[in-house]
Amino acid sequence: MASLISRPYPDSMNNNSGLAFIRLGDEEMKLLFGVSVKSIDPWSWPGGQSRLGKDLRKALHYPKYRYNTFSPFYYGIYDAKDICPFHELLSMIYQHPKYLTYTNLFVNSNYPSTKLLHQSLIRDHRKKIILIINNETSSQKLTELNAWTCEILLYPNNGPLLWQNDKFREQAIGKIVDAAKRYRNRLFLFSIGPLSRVLIHHAWLENPYNRYIDFGSTLDKMTKNRITRPYQSNAELNHDPSYLIKFDTNKRVFHVSSVD
């Protein structure tokens, strides 16, 4: 996955190919199945069907994803036993199993390698990155981020609640669709919670020739200058022994391996 995200400059900027990666975590799964949500971020959901949950389900059911090998659409998933049977989740996803990976691919014990990936992307794709983050980022931090991005799109941190509003939903989709339309062979980095999953869907539909990556909270220390999740200060806190990312400093590549 890391090698797909961080392809060499001549390849990534000249080929008519793209990539999308969305992650289905606890919050997304609960919205999908109408379960109440109490987020670490400043929003919650009392339970029952939400418009965002409905749109998440619609995106999962989109059959066109599986027929676009030139712009593969990857899902990060996990076995959410307390929310739904795993086979039920898999039956909702209209995608070939080879495009399914781990929702926690970038966090926990892999977070140190993810930070190296961030550094690599900023260095290799400077001023060719579109950053999609929450609007709580300070003006001083936005100035710093502007040094290596070509555009920053801001969304409210209570977006999942605002998604119930037709006008907000239309404007939110329109903003990302407009950006996807204006760029080609660029890197879009998303960190706006559950909205990322639906907005990546709309961006990919408009223009599959970009890379749309849901990095989630792994970007928080960089964009907010503070720790928002326990794993950011203790990467071993929730060690998942089923997979591991390692960064080869000599070859400057990432390797994903499975361990028992």
Descriptions of predicted regions:
Residues 148-186:
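A mid-sequence, solvent-exposed acidic-amphipathic segment
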Residues 22, 153-156, 215:
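Hydrophobic residues at beta-strand termini and immediately following loops
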Residues 195-260:
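C-terminal functional extensions of proteins
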Residues 1-147:
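Electropositive, gly/pro-rich neighborhoods at or near active sites that engage anionic ligands
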Residues 129, 186-187:
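Structural motif
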Residues 82, 157-159, 219:
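Residue-level detector of flexible, active-site-proximal loop/helix-junction positions
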Residues 190-193:
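Glycine-rich beta-strand-to-loop/alpha-helix junction loops that act as flexible
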Residues 137-139, 157-160, 195-196:
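Short, catalytically relevant binding-site loops at active-site mouths
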